[in-house]
Amino acid sequence: MSTPGPLKPTLMSRLQLRPEFHRAIRALKLVELASAMLKVRPLRRTLPNGSRYRVRYGESLLMADEIFKREVYRDPFVDRPVRTFIDLGSNVGYFTCYAADRIGKGAIGLSVDANPKMAAETQWHIDHNGWSRVKGLWSVVGFPAEVAQAPFFLNPSNISGSATVLNPNIPAKGAQREITVPTVELDRAWRDHAGDAPVDVMKVDVEGFEVKVLETMPALLRRTHTVVLEWHKWITPREPVDEVLGRAGLRFVKVVTEDPHCGVAFYERPRG
């Protein structure tokens, strides 16, 4: 079994760590300018196995670099069969595209986001690629089954949002706005969609709500083979995540990438 080597930094990943880069972007309103241009003429790209994606937001350029070029979520796909996935916090749907492209047309997936624009963009990618067994949901996760709706906080001038506090260490690009979103019981939603199939890969990026989300689905985690998760340091350290996943039999393998604000960690169920 081979182990992927360390991620290679890209120009984009280096720049995002430099405060002067972010100051210049804000001063020149480069994200807003890029988003205006991309809204008129989105970038369209094709992945190695033929899946297609588009870029309609300036912020998505960094996300595309992380997922498609640096491949921060590649570990669950190395030296193991993968047929099913869950994308929690799908945003514009790039991990959904990455996973389905690696799996092939038979991919079975569930992609969830609480931001209505992001859920719609994820659904566009699903429909555009003809993934008949991948389902998109506009819902928020991490609440008890008896809670039908929950608040969700949007930053209207970019594509971020959270069921908890947005990162206070990064200046917001606009006034935060609260919306009400339907909740979803993920274990039931997965069974309705995929039956008794296990989850080969679960990707989690829920902007600081990681522990709350994981604690609401112990049964589903016990049927999950690998987890790749972004933890957000302004809410929680990684150790509580390790503990919740450990109770489900998922062991911490490594930190894939990390910066002062967040990190990506990989977990797996021991094989054999």
Predicted ranges, named:
Residues 1-272:
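Phosphate/nucleotide-binding beta-alpha loop and adjacent structural elements of enzyme active sites
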